[in-house]
Amino acid sequence: VLSPADKTNVKAAWEKVGGHGAAYGAEALERMFLSFPTTKTYFPHFDLSHGSAQVQGHGKKVADALANAAGHLDDLPSALSALSDLHAHKLRVDPVNFKLLSHCLLVTLAAHHPAEFTPAVHASLDKFLATVSTVLTSKYR
């Protein structure tokens, strides 16, 4: 459960992401593909090379979904319901991959905003991404 301080930290961090969301999302995906090569199996039709339009496009989708979630912290299940259905029933993504991408997102955000990435902000973002991951996997059961 996100505390009021966590919610404040998440909203502030996402405001700092601003117009860089698509680039950060793509960078996090690239980090994930390089660090955890098995995740590539979910994207057999993608050009996974650095800077590819497909990775950039999916990075934007990831960033947009997280921005939407950050704007609906009090009702994440409703905000992410369609995305949860998609990943559980159509794409059938192994839930562990959400944790891997979350880790790569944290690394990306820390790399771009080191001064703002305090231990408290890190903890809040980690809780936020873990909560998003839980919601996305809730329809697997």
UniProtKB/Swiss-Prot annotation:
The modification N6-acetyllysine is found at K16. The keyword Ribosomal protein does not apply. The modification Phosphothreonine is found at T8, T108, T134, T137. One of its GO terms (cellular component) is blood microparticle. The keyword Cell membrane does not apply. The modification N6-succinyllysine is found at K7, K11, K16, K40. One of its GO terms (molecular function) is heme binding. O2 binds at H58. Heterotetramer of two alpha chains and two beta chains. Involved in oxygen transport from the lung to the various peripheral tissues. This is Hemoglobin subunit alpha. The lineage of its organism: Eukaryota, Metazoa, Chordata, Craniata, Vertebrata.
